[in-house]
Regions:
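Acyl-thioester C-C bond-transforming condensing/cleaving domain
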Residues: 1, 74, 80-96, 106-187
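Conserved active-site "lid/cap" helical segment
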Residues: 1-99
Length: 187
């Protein structure tokens, strides 16, 4: 007896591409006053990252959750749609074939949720089973895959779609705590 199978994988990234050390030097160094910060950013061994932010000005005013979330939702919908359509095409499926839709994020949320919005946009079935894993942090991606595995173990003839949408640069914080420096370097 075989278990669930991964049929495809797809990604979509924001168009703005920044070098890791540029993010430190131009975006964050005015707000993170620590000699260790540059070394932490270099040690992360990330060369480039994509961001919904074209430049650092957004972060200067320490924007609140609403401003950050508005940017998240504006970018999440088209990028998620692109990734989903690519994944479905690679798998030889259409949106109506999806039985379980699991959306994961710790960098944005809305009500109605991205799961409901995308299901409507993509014409998914009205009896679609949805799960939104919001605010769980780094392990949510694995939790989403686990949820899909559990659903498919119970219903092997079904198809599950797991979507993770994360825009970490939206949440850079001012301050020189070790936690803030590591989070800025990694996410």
């Amino acid at each position: 007896m075989t278990g669930p199978t991964l049929l495809s994988l797809a990604t979509a990234v924001p168009e703005n591409r920044h070098r890791q050390m540029e993010i430190h030097d131009r975006w964050l160094s005015p707000y993170i006053k620590s000699q260790r910060a540059r070394a932490i950013f270099a040690a992360a061994e990330i060369e480039t990252r994509h961001s919904v932010l074209a430049e650092s000005g957004f972060l200067a005013s320490e924007p609140g959750t609403k401003a950050r979330n508005d940017l998240y939702m504006g970018a999440a919908r088209p990028l998620a749609t692109t990734a989903i359509c690519q994944a479905l095409l690679k798998a030889g499926l259409n949106s109506g074939d999806i039985d379980h839709f699991i959306v994961v994020s710790c960098t944005g949320f809305d009500n109605p949720g991205l799961d409901v919005i995308l299901a409507g946009d993509l014409g998914m079935r009205s009896n679609l089973r949805r799960t939104a894993l919001i605010g769980m942090g780094c392990h949510a991606g694995l939790t989403g895959l686990d949820r899909a595995m559990l659903e498919l173990a119970a219903r092997p003839e079904h198809h599950a779609l797991v979507l993770a949408v994360e825009f970490g640069t939206l949440h850079f914080q001012h301050g020189s705590s070790l936690e803030n420096m590591v989070a800025g370097a990694l996410f």
